[in-house]
Amino acid sequence: MRVAIVNDMPLAVEALRRSLAHDPELSLAWIASDGLQAVRRCAADLPDVILMDLMMPVMNGVEATRLIMAESPCAIIVVTSDVLQHTSLVFEAMGHGALDAVDTPVLGRGDPKAAAQRLLRKIRNAGWLIGKKTVALERTTAMASSDTDAALVVIGASAGGPPSLAAVLRALPASFPAAIVLVQHVDAAFTSGMAAWLNEQCVLPVRLASDGLRPEAGVVLLAGAGEHLVLGAERKLHYTTEPRESVYSPSIDVFFHSVAQHWRGRAAGVLLTGMGQDGALGLKAMRERGFFTIAQDRATSAVYGMPKAAAALDAACEILPLGDIAPRLEKVFAPPANPLFN
């Protein structure tokens, strides 16, 4: 894969160059010292992956990400010093389509190869996405529905997800009768901050999903990172390392499949903006189980990858612009029960 570096600090550039050298499948495409240079270089020579700094002269990484994803879209990973000190900027960049974020490796500290591994792992994950490689998951066998009135909304998102999730949650009232579980591709370092940030964006309470917790009406749970979130037969949430071959942990497909298999009440699945195909097969499984499913439309998706894959599989009952998703969910779960679930 051809990787470009966008960073104005010579030491950071050298650290990134040395990190890339540890993987023979990676080559350096070009280096830009500010966001504007990166936008122009992408227009002339599009790399497979961009390692984008945030704080740079002329044009910062957030604005550069926005312009690149609008004009010459490719996989972008935010790589900056101390990402936790720039959480709001990271979420803003992800809102424009950046896939992930990681600290810049530091020269002269510990084993250089070990220090590079976290960055290289994220680059490889991006490679899986742009290569459109997917992990085959077994189709689930639907369990018979019970008479319970429990209602559940599950939402998956990746690149461009944080502001899209906020937009959906912000439009839902405090009286929304369904439990909500979110699966967002994000580094483990950001999950607590993202839950707190989303909690400030809406009237519904948002917190991290903990092992053994049951989804609760009117409460939003965000999947933690590093392991897959699944719904068990007893309707409790659990974390698991299987399947290990999945590109992202948590995987949207893994969670959606578990919902299709074990949830016995009413449910709706929503697949938002994101690169790759994660979630498309799981959304299809939910639709085949009889649940209502939505995919975000092309026009309002920061990255039209996952929703596009869902549309191609006929996994979505409806394809909607972002602003119409929350009102549709309100109608679906409004009393009396929607005929779609009868």
Swiss-Prot record:
EC number(s) reported in the record: 3.1.1.61, 3.5.1.44
Span of domain Response regulatory: 2-119
Active site per the UniProt annotation: S158, H185, D278
GO BP of this protein: chemotaxis
InterPro entries: CheB-like, CheB_C, CheY-like_superfamily, Sig_transdc_resp-reg_Me-estase, Sig_transdc_resp-reg_receiver
Domain notes: Contains a C-terminal catalytic domain, and an N-terminal region which modulates catalytic activity.
Protein name: Protein-glutamate methylesterase/protein-glutamine glutaminase 1
Gene from which the chain derives: cheB1
